[in-house]
């Protein structure tokens, strides 16, 4: 497997629960290095731009409203098969369907307030990382 980078967002519901450290520990225990991170309060334009691919979906406005409701932690994760590992750690989008021990099963409240976001493919990861870290040099530890 190749070393990959993926974007992860700890959403407002999880930030409000003060579980950033627990989520970071799960990343690191599973071989994912945090090579860039920052806390940000998304504007409506930021959230709409990031989730533009979902603009025509019925949940778009609720998603944007939720993502601007509080600060988020945005991080770049790096490691072998990072995209798949992160998605496995997150669990199913609907926390009621997420496997026990996943971030969403343990911490998410609903399909809307589902604690985390993660890139779903290498192409998506590249676009999402550039969205939040456009001019940042990211270095491997």
Curated annotation (Swiss-Prot):
The keyword Transcription does not apply. The active site is at residue 117. One of its GO terms (cellular component) is cytoplasm. Keywords: ATP-binding, Cytoplasm, Kinase, Magnesium, Metal-binding, Nucleotide metabolism, Nucleotide-binding, Phosphoprotein, Transferase. The keyword Aminoacyl-tRNA synthetase does not apply. ATP binds at residues 11, 59, 87, 93, 104, 114. One of its GO terms (molecular function) is ATP binding. Homotetramer. This is Nucleoside diphosphate kinase. It comes from Nitrosospira multiformis (strain ATCC 25196 / NCIMB 11849 / C 71). The gene is ndk.
């Amino acid at each position: 497997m190749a070393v990959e980078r993926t974007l992860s967002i700890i959403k407002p519901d999880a930030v409000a629960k003060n579980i950033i450290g627990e989520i970071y520990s799960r990343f690191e225990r599973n071989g994912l290095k945090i090579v860039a991170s920052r806390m940000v309060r998304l504007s409506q334009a930021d959230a709409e731009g990031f989730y533009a691919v979902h603009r025509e979906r019925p949940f778009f406005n609720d998603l944007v409203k939720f993502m601007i409701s509080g600060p988020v932690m945005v991080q770049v994760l790096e490691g072998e098969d990072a995209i798949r590992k992160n998605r496995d750690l997150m669990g199913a989008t609907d926390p009621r369907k997420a496997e026990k021990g996943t971030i969403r099963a343990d911490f998410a409240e609903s399909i809307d307030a589902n604690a985390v976001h993660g890139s779903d493919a290498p192409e998506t990861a590249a676009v999402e990382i550039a969205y939040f870290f456009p001019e940042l040099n990211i270095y491997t530890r």
